Amino acid sequence: LGLQNATSPIMEELIAFHDHALMIIFLISSLVLYIISLMLTTKLTHTSTMNAQEIEMIWTILPAVILIMIALPSLRILYMTDEFNKPYLTLKAIGHQWYWSYEYSDYEDLAFDSYITPTYFLEPGEFRLLEVDNRTTLPMEADIRVLISSQDVLHSWAVPALGVKTDAIPGRLNQAMLTSTRPGLYYGQCSEICGSNHSFMPIVLEFIYFQDFEVW
């Protein structure tokens, strides 16, 4: 169990922030448990104390410092996710009940629908409920802009290994940036409950080398 292996700079930053926040939470929890154990096993109580400026300063400043230590890396990643350089390719992903459709508009008018592959059509080594009939092919090590929308209800286009999760909202275009540092297949799913077949909207991205993508 755990996070998927990162294949994009954003996901690497998210994993590092997860470890950073988890370490702070662990230290705080250990300190609280230590103080509770001291209070239960020793006479570390002062019921007659009416005023202690030093202690009040400590438990005011220390939480503020801890929050700043968590907030600064979080804000940095937030701005990174909204940073859009000149994209090499623009892909449009449109959610439907219950499949995805994709459009490549930079090269030619290429569009297709991507449905889940039924279990009885799976080949050996393929994943149940994660395979599709038409994979989305993209070039690796390139900045790719994905425009995400919906044709009917709320959906969410999510690929955990790339650190991407963007809502698909009817009548609105949201955008996300993709960059893969290595070739391969990366799986995702709709991450917004959208009806009875919500669990059957997989996403499969196939990242290949530049020269292979141009041929494709």
UniProtKB/Swiss-Prot annotation:
Molecular function, one GO term: copper ion binding
Cofactors required: Cu cation
Subcellular location(s) of the protein: Mitochondrion inner membrane
GO cellular component: mitochondrial inner membrane; respiratory chain complex IV
Natural source organism: Callimico goeldii (Goeldi's marmoset)
Positions of Cu cation A2 binding: 190, 192, 194, 198
Cofactor note: Binds a dinuclear copper A center per subunit.
NCBIfam families xref list: CoxB (TIGR02866)
Protein name (database record): Cytochrome c oxidase subunit 2
Parts of the chain on the Mitochondrial matrix side: 40-53
